[in-house]
Amino acid sequence: MPKLKTKSAVKKRFKFTATGKVIASQAGKKHFMRRRTKAQIRNLRGTTILCPQDGHNIKKYFLPYGI
């Protein structure tokens, strides 16, 4: 039986910390930026750590054999 492939879409969007947490970029910065303050736009830069429930789902989907 061949090896299972990792999902490429998930591979491009998420990274893992050494302790197993999932890092993703901030959502909500593609459009409608006019109505936001400069501070809000600044805070949307960079990455964030997902909550444990979402991180578990990503790991289950990202790694074919699970953790």
From Swiss-Prot:
Keyword presence, Transferase: no
Any one annotated GO CC term: cytosolic large ribosomal subunit
One GO term of the biological process aspect: translation
Database matches in Pfam families: Ribosomal_L35p
Keywords: Ribonucleoprotein, Ribosomal protein
GO MF: structural constituent of ribosome
InterPro entries linked: Ribosomal_bL35, Ribosomal_bL35-like, Ribosomal_bL35_CS, Ribosomal_bL35_sf
Top-level lineage group: Bacteria
PANTHER family (alphabetical): 54S RIBOSOMAL PROTEIN BL35M, LARGE RIBOSOMAL SUBUNIT PROTEIN BL35M
Family: Belongs to the bacterial ribosomal protein bL35 family.
Name of the protein in question: Large ribosomal subunit protein bL35
Taxonomic source organism: Rickettsia prowazekii (strain Madrid E)
Gene behind this protein: rpmI
